[in-house]
Amino acid sequence: MWHKNGVKPQSQRRGPPPPLNAEQLRELALRYVGKYATTRAKLRQYLTRKIRERGWADGAAPDLEALAVRFAELGLIDDAAYALAKSRTLAARGYGKRRLADQLRQAGVDGVDQAEAAAHADDAAVDAALRLAQRRRIGPFAAAAADPQQREKWIAAMIRGGHGFALAKAISGLPPGEEFDLDQLRERFRVIDA
C-alpha cells in the first residue's frame, strides 16, 4: 500500500530488526566505543540493552565481559583514562571528589582505576570549590554578607557539589568582595578533605 504522496512511510517499510549475531554485536561495540568515551561496564550495559531490544540469533549467549576485556586490551577502552578525564571535567565545572566518586561508581569504574582520578580531585579540590562558589555567588563572590541561614544554604550547596564540610564552611565564611590568600587556602585543605 502506498502513502498518499506515493512513498511508504519508513515505519511501514521495515519490519522488526533482525536478531544480532556475534559479528554484528562486535560491530555495534566498535561503533559505540568509537563514538563515546566509555568504560567496560557501560559497554556491557549498552550491548545488553541492544540484545534485549533485538534478540540473539546464535545459540549460546554472548560473553560480553570477554568482549569488553578484549577492547580494553586493544586500548579501545581505558577505565583509568575515563576516570581521569571525568575528574578534570568535573573539577573544571566546580565539583568535588565526592561527586566524582558517585559518577565513577555509576559508570562502573572500580577502585584501582579511580586512584589517579581521586589524586587529581584532591589536588584540584580548592580550585574546584572556588569555581563552584564563583558560579553560585558564594562567600567571597557574593554580593553581600550572608546571614547564618543563607550561609547554611551555601554550605549545603557546596556539599551537594561534592566538597567536604570543612572546605565548604571555610569558603562560605570568606567575606564578600575581599581578597583572600589562595595559596594559604590550598595548603590548609590539601589533606583535610581527602
Specify the residue positions occupied by each region the protein language model found.
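An alpha-helical, amphipathic repeat domain used for nucleic-acid recognition
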Residues: 1-194
